């Protein structure tokens, strides 16, 4: 079967070319090289190396070198580097001009595959790019880009610019994004020392666009107007037709490797499995955009930031986005159970270098219209070594039964974890936040917490996760109390009586009695111990509230109304209560309340937060999923770190660490409302 990568440029002429090649093999030794054979030599090897080597053995002297060059190309693509080197060494000394060009290009590509970048650059310098065919030019620029090892330089940027007109579709948009990423990494010294030729209008346009972005990025409306003016000055510039994704362009639909990019032997290749159609499409798109932005280097956090800096940035963000719609946390839309096992984070995972990121190919697969088993099989057939996804919980629950041989970073969690050395689970869930809240509240010295949660499945899950984590901290009893609808809350606040805190103990698996006892073959049900009601007149000293901002605006005053004085319990909330554009009245009303959220939304990178929030129209649920995509890239690109005890990673969704079952836990950022401002929680 022919490799898939032959389809892109040669599908239309593959059969006639094969017939022409077979015809040549039977021609007399004096037959001239056909144009079709030249195209095959200059293009991408479409068959296996074994086939080409067999044709080489059966061919006359005139066409033998052509088949040998094709065999060398195929050997490099297949990762058979020693054999490719041996064949290069046995090429005849007398080659035609076009054959000599192909030999030099193959030598450079082999050097890149062997990580001998000095040799690759030396050989590339001997090639006249203008004399190469379009297919060879594409390979030439790809080799230049790889030889640069993602070290930003004028040579690298010129290679991206040279490659651009040879690409189409998603590959073209990725080229635009990669060019922009390389430009944004230039420092002021690089820019001031750059010498531009008079005919490099495209490069000059890129530099002018970069200058606009650097000077006007703080005011999005000014930047947008400047970009429109720039488009008028450079109407034929590639970025005028397709802006970089960071500046508002459409991200590639599938982050597949660019043409000619192949995973090195034994290297990493990632398959991203997402539902690109249907009800979860918006969630999947946000994750994919975050994943792609992190991979290309366009989105990263300046971690670690100081708590005061985070609080100030969050204040600025809240003031800058008034009137945003209330949006719940995405946790409720992607339910998953957490089995938190706190890890002592003593080792920080090393940051992935840009050079490493650039060498990891990624391809996106749509899980919305085919069985998960088929998608995984196709990804494995395409050469993937790591799978990120699936996202939907029902598909995640299928993974243990499929027993995949690839590494899998699932983007959700099943109700019950079945340990598997190849599967890790990374989810944004209310249970995850509740477990982190239990640890945070316990560290503040609280002894008797109460959870105020809504009736229904969401409340059940949060209560169970909080209680389980709390018992792992201290073994104490957790109380729970359920809240009603907005109508019920409004009726209660109109009564003026406040909320009586009549909590009931949470029965967890650890504290639940055995259901029965067997004596002499007779089963006797155990009697459950009586559960006494506990009120705030007792010893409740902390209340963890699960509520939307509108619900919280009713709940907190009623709690304060009923519990006055110095002994009132401390109040805590989840990210469900935090949204864009919280006005000053709300912030003053929330005095003293502490809440948690992901670093991206609490000010770890104000510029990125503003950009992504604007992109998603202040829908914080999608911003959180964008951050999840960023962290999924970090985790998947160095999957082995997840299995190292004690390791942690500073991510956009929190400080990440993995349990013994490879469940990724998140330590969130905590802030507090104080005098109308957000300050670090003490």
UniProtKB/Swiss-Prot annotation:
**Record key words, sorted:** Cell outer membrane, Cell shape, Lipoprotein, Membrane, Palmitate, Peptidoglycan synthesis, Signal
- Keyword Nucleotide-binding attributed: no
- Report the main location listed first in the record: membrane
| CDD domains according to UniProt | PBP1_YraM_LppC_lipoprotein-like
- Where is this chain compositionally biased, Low complexity type? 248-262
SS bonds (residue pairs): none
Stated name of the protein = Penicillin-binding protein activator LpoA
Organism expressing this protein natively: Dickeya chrysanthemi (strain Ech1591) (Dickeya zeae (strain Ech1591))
């Amino acid at each position: 079967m022919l490799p898939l990568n032959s389809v892109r440029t040669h599908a239309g002429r593959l059969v006639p070319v094969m017939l022409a090649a077979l015809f040549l093999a039977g021609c007399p030794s004096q037959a001239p090289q056909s144009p079709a054979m030249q195209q095959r030599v200059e293009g991408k090897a479409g068959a296996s190396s074994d086939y080409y080597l067999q044709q080489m053995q059966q061919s006359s002297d005139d066409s033998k070198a052509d088949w040998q060059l094709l065999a060398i190309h195929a050997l490099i693509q297949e990762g058979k580097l020693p054999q490719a080197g041996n064949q290069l060494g046995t090429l005849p000394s007398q080659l035609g001009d076009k054959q000599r060009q192909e030999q030099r290009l193959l030598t450079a590509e082999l050097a890149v595959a062997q990580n001998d970048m000095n040799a690759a650059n030396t050989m590339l310098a001997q090639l006249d790019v203008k004399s190469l065919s379009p297919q060879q030019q594409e390979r030439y620029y790809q080799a230049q880009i790889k030889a640069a090892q993602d070290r930003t330089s004028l040579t690298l940027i010129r290679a991206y610019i040279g490659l651009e007109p040879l690409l189409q579709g998603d590959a073209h948009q990725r080229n635009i994004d990669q060019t922009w990423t390389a430009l944004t990494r230039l420092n002021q010294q690089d820019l001031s020392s750059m010498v531009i030729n008079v005919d490099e209008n495209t490069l000059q346009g890129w530099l002018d666009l970069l200058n606009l972005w650097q000077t006007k990025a703080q005011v999005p409306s000014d930047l947008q107007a400047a970009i429109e003016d720039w488009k008028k000055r450079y109407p034929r510039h590639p970025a005028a037709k397709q802006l970089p994704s960071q500046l508002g362009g459409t991200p590639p639909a599938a982050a597949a490797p660019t043409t000619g990019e192949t995973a090195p032997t034994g290297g990493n290749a990632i398959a991203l499995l997402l539902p690109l159609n249907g009800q979860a499409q918006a969630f999947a798109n946000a994750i994919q955009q975050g994943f792609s932005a992190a991979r290309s280097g366009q989105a990263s956090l300046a971690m670690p930031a100081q708590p005061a800096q985070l609080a100030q940035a969050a204040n600025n963000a809240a003031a800058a986005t008034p009137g945003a719609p209330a949006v719940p946390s995405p946790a409720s839309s992607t339910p998953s159970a957490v089995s938190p096992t706190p890890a002592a984070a003593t080792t920080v995972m090393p940051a992935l270098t840009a050079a490493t990121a650039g060498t990891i190919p990624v391809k996106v697969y749509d899980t919305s219209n085919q069985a998960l088993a088929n998608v995984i099989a196709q990804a494995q057939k395409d050469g993937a070594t790591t799978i990120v996804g699936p996202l939907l919980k029902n598909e995640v629950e299928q993974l243990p039964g499929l027993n995949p041989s690839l590494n899998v970073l699932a983007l959700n969690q099943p109700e019950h974890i079945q340990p598997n050395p190849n599967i890790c689970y990374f989810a944004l869930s209310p249970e995850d936040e509740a477990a982190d809240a239990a640890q945070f509240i316990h560290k503040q010295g609280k002894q008797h917490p109460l959870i105020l949660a809504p009736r229904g499945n969401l409340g059940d899950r949060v209560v169970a996760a909080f209680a389980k984590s709390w018992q792992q901290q201290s073994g104490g009893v957790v109380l729970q109390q359920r809240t009603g609808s907005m109508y019920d809350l409004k009726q209660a606040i109109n009564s003026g009586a406040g909320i009586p805190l009549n909590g009931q103990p949470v029965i967890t698996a650890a504290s639940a009695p055995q259901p029965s006892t067997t004596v002499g073959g007779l089963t006797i049900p155990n009697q459950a111990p009586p559960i006494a009601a506990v009120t705030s007149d007792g010893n409740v000293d902390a209340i963890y509230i699960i509520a939307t901002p509108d619900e919280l605006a009713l709940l907190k005053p009623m709690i304060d109304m009923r519990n006055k004085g110095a002994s009132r319990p401390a109040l805590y909330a989840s990210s469900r209560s935090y949204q864009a554009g919280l006005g000053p009245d709300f912030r003053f009303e929330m005095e003293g309340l502490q809440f948690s959220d992901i670093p991206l939304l609490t000010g770890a990178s104000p510029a990125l937060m503003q950009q992504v929030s604007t992109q998603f129209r202040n829908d914080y649920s999608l911003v959180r999923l964008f951050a999840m995509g960023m962290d999924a890239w970090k985790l998947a690109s160095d999957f082995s770190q997840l299995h190292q005890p004690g390791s942690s990673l500073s991510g956009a969704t929190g400080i990440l660490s993995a349990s013994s079952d490879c469940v990724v836990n998140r330590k969130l950022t905590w802030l507090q409302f104080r005098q109308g401002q957000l300050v670090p929680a003490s």
